Amino acid sequence: MKAVIYNGPYDVKVKDVPDAKIVRPTDVLVRITTTNICGSDLHMYEGRTSFEQGRILGHENLGEVVEIGSGVERVKVGDYVCLPFNVGCGFCENCEKGLTGFCLTTNPGTVGAAYGFAEMGSWEGGQAELLRVPFADFNCLGLPPEAVAKEDDYARLSD
């Protein structure tokens, strides 16, 4: 698949990388149709973070579910979903309190987890053709069919 890869400060390129894949039964794969470039991405682009070279950028994503893990119950292939940038598990103490930005499962020992963001876990970003979404029943916000025509508007919900 093609993805936007961080190579160091002021150096990003679209490269061919291995396809994202389902790793756990609660994962889904989303074909990304829209992704935002956020002002926060500039921190990494300009080298003001410890973002590792070779990582895929992109923490504000939206797209169509193309594959589901065996443990996914709510999300279905073909669903159009918005993916909030915070990656949560949905069942830890913090997630149950609504503090998903401080999930204790997805990036233990630090503040929260996010797709393709410095110091917020090893989750790859969505500036790629495919994105692995963990704990999909919790992290995928289902959108109505008419959302396809307004995907740029709905993508803003991922921030």
Task: Annotate the PLM regions.
Residues 13, 38, 64:
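Conserved Rossmann-like nucleotide-binding pocket used by diverse enzymes
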Residues 13, 51, 127-129:
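Residue-level marker for the onset of beta-strands and adjacent loop->beta junctions
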Residues 40-46:
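Cytochrome P450 core scaffold surrounding the K-helix E-X-X-R motif
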Residues 18-35, 48-96, 101, 123-125, ...:
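Glycine-rich beta-strand-centered segment in the early N-terminal region that forms part
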Residues 1-4:
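Short structural boundary motif marking the start of a folded domain
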Residues 11-19:
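Short glycine/threonine/proline-enriched tight-turn/helix- or strand-capping micro-motif at secondary-structure
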Residues 7-11, 35-37:
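Short polar catalytic/cofactor-binding loops
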Residues 91-159:
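NAD(P)H dinucleotide-binding glycine-rich loop of Rossmann-like/cofactor-binding domains
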